Amino acid sequence: MSLGPVGMSGGMDINSMVSKIVDAERVPKQQRIDNDRTTINASISAYGRLRESLDTMKNLMANFRQEKAFAVRTVETTDDNIVSATATTDAIAGKYAIDVLQLAQSHKVASDVLPEDAKFGPGKLQISLGDDRFNIEVRSRSKLIDVVRGINGAKDNPGVRASVINDVEGPRLILASNLSGKDHQIKVSVEAERGNPLKYFEYQTLEDRVNALEEARAAAEEVLGPLQAPQQPDQPEILDENGNPLPPEAQKAADNAQDDAQDDASQEPISAAGAEAAKAGQEAIDKANQRSSLRPEERIPGWTETASGTLLDSYEEPELELDEKAIEKAPDVPGWNNAASGTLTDSYVTTKEAKQLLEQEKAEIEQKIADEKQELDAKVERGELSEEQAKQIHRAKLDPQERERLEKIDEAEAKIAKAQSSFEEYLGMTEVQAGQDSEVLLDGVAKLSSHNNVIEDAIEGVDLTLKGKSEPNKPPAEIGVEYDRQSVRSDIENFVSAYNSFYQTSQALSSVDPTTGQKGPLAGDSTVRSADSRLKAVFSSRIDQAPENLKSLTEFGITTTRQGTLEINYDMLDRQLNNNFNELEKFFGGNTGFAKRIEDAIHGITGITGSIRTREKSLTEQNYRLNDDQAALDRRMEGLEKRTHAKFTAMQDATGKMQGQLGALMSALG
C-alpha cells in the first residue's frame, strides 16, 4: 500500500515505519518458502535427468526386441560404376556375380533434315507410346515449333517429349520417350494428303510396314477367299535307267528338252531342232546319273580319307538357281530363303499378285457393262461428270450383289495401295535409339530384365541399380550381402554408454563432497540406489533361452569395473558377432530375454507407478502446497500492512488534536 507521509510536522514517517514492521514479519516465512521451492525444483530436475538416461537405455533395448533387429543387411559392390544394390531384412547373405548385358534406355526417333521455312498441315498426327496413344491436330501452314508445342502440350500425352535439333544441314524433329523399356515404343501415323510435309513425321518400322502389307493381303483374301498362286501344269516325272527319280537339276534339264522337242514336233515329225533337244535332255540325264554315282573324292574338291569326315559333313553341293519368275517374286515373299525357295515362290501369293487378282475379278464384273463404261469415260473426259459420279452411275446398272462385291474389292484395293505406298514411298522418321529393357546375367546362369535400370528383388530382398555396362574382357561386378554386424556392435556400445551415463549422473546427484560437505540434490535418496541395484541384478542374471556360450552379458565381454561402470572387451564381443551372429536374437529377444528384462527393470523405475515417477509426483504436490503457502503469506502481510498503517494514522490524528488543545490552552493562560 502506498501512502504519502502524513504528520511530518510531528516528525513521523508512517510508511517507512509500516514497511519495516511488515518486513520483519514476512522475511523469515518467505525465506523458508523460497528454500523449500529451490530444493524441490532441484530434486525434480535431478529425477528428470535420471529418467532421461534410463529411458535411453530402455529405447535401445526395445530396438533389440524387434523381430528383425538382427536381420539388417549390408551390401557392398566391387564396381560401383557398374551396379549398386540395397538389401532388405529378407535378403540372404552371400556373394553374387553381376554381368550387366545392357542398360535400359528410352526409344528415340528423328526426322530427316527439314527445310527452314517448311510449313506443315493440315492433318493429324496419331502418336503412340506403348499401349497409350494421343492425337495432335495440325493446322494448315503450321511451323515446326507449332508441332513441337502441340505434342508437348497435349493433356493426354503419356510421356512423349518433342524437341528440335539444329543440324548443320537444317532442323530435325526428335521424339523421345520419357519411359524406358521395350514396351514403351513410339509410333507415329499421319493422316494427311499425299505430298503433305507432315508425312516426314510418320514413324513405322520396316516390320510394321511389312505387317501392313500382310494385313492388306489378308483383306484381299477375305474378299477373294484363300489365295493360290497360278499353278504350272504338272510335268511327268522322268526316271533314270534304274527307275529312280532324277536329281532336280537333271529333271529340269530333261523338262526343258522335252518342251523344246514338243514345240518342234508340232511343226514337223522329227526336225533337227527336236533331235537336238532330245539329245540335250538325254545328256542332262546322263550327266545327273553320272554325278550321283561319283565317289566323294571325284566330286568334292580336296577330298582325302583323312579329312573325309570333316568334308562330308561340311561340303555343300551347289544350289540350284531360281528361274526368272522366282527371282522376280522372291523379294516380295516374307521369310524367303534358298532352302525354302521352291515352296515359297510357288505357293505364296504376294500383295502385288493379290492386287492383280482383285483387278482381274473387278474387270470380269465390269465387263458386263463395258459399253456403258466407255460412254461414261467419255463424259468424264468432257467434264460432264466427275469420276465418282461416273462410277456410281456405272455400278448402278449392276445387281446389288455385284455392287456389294465391287465395294469390297475397292476397299481391299485401297488398303493394298496404302500399304504399298507406305512401304515403297516411306519418308518418315528413323530410329536413333532403340527402346530396350535392362538385362543382367546373375552368377552366369540367370538372366534378369527390367523396363528401367532398377531391378527389384533381383535376388530375394535385394534391389539392383544398374549404372553401366559390363566390359567383355573384365570379370563381372560382385555384390556381397552380409549381416549388419557393425550396426549391432554400435547398438551394444550405445547401451553400455547409456548405462555409464546414468551411473555417473546418479553418483553426481546423490554424492556428498567430503571436503565442503555439499550434498547433491538426491543425496541419501533410496530411489537412486534402488534403480542401480535393479539394473545390475539384470546384468549379472543368466538368460536360460540363450545358447550355452551366450547365457550372460559377460559372454559378450561386458563387465562391471571397480568404479561401478560397464566396460567392453572388444575381442570377445567381435568373436561373438562373427561366430554366433544368428544366435544373438536368442539372448536379447523374446519375452524373457535380456532386452525385455532391462525394459521391465527400467519401467519399474520410470513408469507411471515407478519410484522416480512417484517421487516426482510427490515433489510436484509439495510445490503446489508451497504455492498455497505463498498466497496465504501474501494475504496475511497485506492485512498486517493495512492494520499497522491504520494504527499509526489514528495515533497521528490523536497527536494532532492534543497539540491543538495544548496550543489553545497555552494561549488562554497567556
Swiss-Prot record:
Q: List the disulfide bonds.
A: none
Q: What is this protein called?
A: Polar flagellar hook-associated protein 2
- PANTHER family registered for this protein in UniProt: FLAGELLAR CAP/ASSEMBLY PROTEIN FLID, FLAGELLAR HOOK-ASSOCIATED PROTEIN 2
Q: Where is the composition biased (Basic and acidic residues)?
A: 284-300
What Gene Ontology cellular-component terms does the record carry?
bacterial-type flagellum filament cap; bacterial-type flagellum hook; extracellular region
- What superkingdom does the record give? Bacteria
**Localization per record:** Secreted; Bacterial flagellum
Stretches of the chain forming a coiled coil according to its record: 342-428
Tell me what else is known.
V.parahaemolyticus possesses two flagellar systems: a single polar flagellum propels the bacterium in liquid (swimming), while multiple lateral (peritrichous) flagella move the bacterium over surfaces (swarming). The polar flagellum is synthesized constitutively but lateral flagella are produced only under conditions in which the polar flagellum is not functional.
Which controlled-vocabulary keywords does the entry list?
Bacterial flagellum, Coiled coil, Secreted
Q: What does this protein do?
A: Required for the morphogenesis and for the elongation of the flagellar filament by facilitating polymerization of the flagellin monomers at the tip of growing filament. Forms a capping structure, which prevents flagellin subunits (transported through the central channel of the flagellum) from leaking out without polymerization at the distal end. Important for swimming motility.
Composition bias, kind Acidic residues: at what positions?
Answer: 257-266
Q: How is the subunit organization of this protein annotated in UniProt? A: Homopentamer.
Q: Where is the composition biased (Low complexity)?
A: 272-283
Query: Which InterPro entries does its entry note?
Result: Flagellin_hook_IN_motif, FliD, FliD_C, FliD_N
Q: What are the start and end residues of every segment in region (Disordered)?
A: 226-300
Q: Which family does it belong to?
A: Belongs to the FliD family.
Organism of this sequence: Vibrio parahaemolyticus serotype O3:K6 (strain RIMD 2210633)
Q: Which GO terms describe its biological process?
A: bacterial-type flagellum-dependent cell motility; cell adhesion
* Pfam families in UniProt: Flagellin_IN, FliD_C, FliD_N
